[in-house]
Regions:
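Histidine-acidic metal/acid-base catalytic patches
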Residues: 3-12, 16-147
Length: 147
C-alpha cells in the first residue's frame, strides 16, 4: 500500500492458533517473540499500530478434533444449515478462546511491540466475568503507557 496511513493490527490469539503446540502462556510469549524477531530484523516493528491482546491455547482441542474427524468423518451435507452454523460457531469458540493473556513476559512483549492501541476482547459469561478479566489483564499490563 502506498499510503502513510497503514499499519498492522496484531491479534495475539489468532497468531497463537497458527500452531497446536502451545501449552502455556509462556510458550505463547516465546512463539510471539520469535515472530516479532523477524519484523524487528526487517526494521518493520514500527508498522504494528495495534494489538488485540488475548490468550488462545486451543491446540489440544484442535488435535483431538482432527483425530475424531479422521476416525468418524461428518457428512456436512446431511446437517441442517442452522445446526451446522451452531456447530461451526461452537467449534470456533473452542479454538479461539479469547482469554486474558497473563503470564511471565506478557507485559514485556507488549512493551516490545509498543502498539498505539490495545484491544481487550474476551469470551465471557457475564458482565462481572468480563470486568474480572479486564481487571486481571490490567494488573499484568500495569496500565503501561506506550508511545
Amino acid at each position: 500500500m502506498h499510503t502513510q496511513r497503514k499499519g498492522i493490527m496484531l491479534d495475539t490469539g489468532h497468531y497463537m492458533n497458527t500452531t497446536t503446540q502451545l501449552k502455556t502462556p509462556e510458550d505463547a510469549v516465546a512463539y510471539l517473540n520469535k515472530m516479532i524477531d523477524k519484523y524487528e530484523k526487517a526494521q518493520m516493528l514500527h508498522w504494528f499500530k495495534g494489538m488485540h491482546l488475548q490468550l488462545s491455547l486451543g491446540g489440544d482441542y484442535v488435535r483431538k478434533q482432527r483425530k475424531e474427524w479422521r476416525e468418524h468423518p461428518i457428512d456436512f451435507d446431511k446437517i441442517p444449515f442452522y445446526e451446522l452454523f451452531r456447530l461451526a460457531y461452537d467449534h470456533a469458540c473452542h479454538i479461539d478462546l479469547h482469554q486474558p493473556f497473563i503470564g511471565e513476559g506478557v507485559r514485556e512483549f507488549v512493551e516490545r511491540v509498543a502498539p498505539k492501541y490495545i484491544t481487550l476482547e474476551y469470551q465471557q459469561n457475564s458482565r462481572e466475568e468480563y470486568e474480572q478479566f479486564v481487571e486481571t489483564q490490567s494488573k499484568i499490563l500495569k496500565w503501561i503507557t506506550i508511545r
